[in-house]
């Protein structure tokens, strides 16, 4: 029989201070975006840049090395660690080709490396990917259909229609993950879009 285990929730394991109060300070955000000590986690179509070493880890790039890309992609402040601000930057908008960042790492599907990441790295990547996917799916107001714009360090989108101006916030969708067992066997499933050989619990 399979022994039940408890796996920590990656979304609850982050070590960053999410800097809620600082998100509204545009001057502080602008200064941090250009600060050489700030770090950026690039993503391309939801795939984070992963540094392949002895163990995979997020490939954080100095903000000054990638500052021009902030104008082309969606970005969000993930938080601060001490004096270092950490941002996520989605570079795969509108079918753009993946930029060549091979000197830092490779864009990798999170499911391929998630189970072998350190807990804090998994938390950072899950948070960044979720937030960037939310931006991609909320470019238009659900109330009036007008375009939305990012505000508060990427943690809010606001309708650009002045008659509407509704703020939109990231949400967390509830989900259930289960393992169906019978003796020493387990039922697994897969999606047709997944790479060959990849299976999952239900």
Protein language model regions, located:
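A broadly conserved sequence feature marking short terminus-proximal activation segments
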Residues: 66-137
């Amino acid at each position: 029989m399979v022994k039940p285990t408890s796996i920590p929730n990656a979304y609850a394991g982050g070590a960053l201070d999410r800097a809620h109060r600082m998100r509204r300070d545009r001057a502080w955000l602008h200064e941090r975006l250009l600060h050489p000590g700030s770090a950026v986690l690039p993503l391309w179509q939801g795939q984070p840049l992963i540094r392949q070493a002895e163990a995979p880890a997020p490939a954080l790039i100095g903000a000054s090395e990638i500052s021009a890309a902030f104008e082309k992609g969606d970005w969000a402040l993930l938080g601060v660690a001490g004096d270092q601000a950490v941002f996520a930057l989605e570079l795969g908008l509108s079918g753009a080709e993946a930029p060549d960042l091979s000197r830092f790492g490779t864009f990798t599907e999170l499911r391929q490396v998630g189970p072998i990441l350190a807990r804090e790295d998994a938390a950072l990547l899950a948070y960044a990917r979720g937030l960037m996917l939310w931006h991609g799916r909320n470019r238009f107001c659900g109330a009036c259909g007008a375009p939305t714009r990012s505000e508060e360090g990427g943690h809010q989108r606001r309708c650009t229609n002045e008659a509407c101006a509704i703020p939109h916030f990231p949400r967390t969708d509830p989900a259930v993950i289960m393992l169906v067992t019978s003796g020493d066997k387990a039922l697994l499933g897969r999606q047709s879009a997944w790479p060959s050989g990849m299976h999952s619990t239900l």
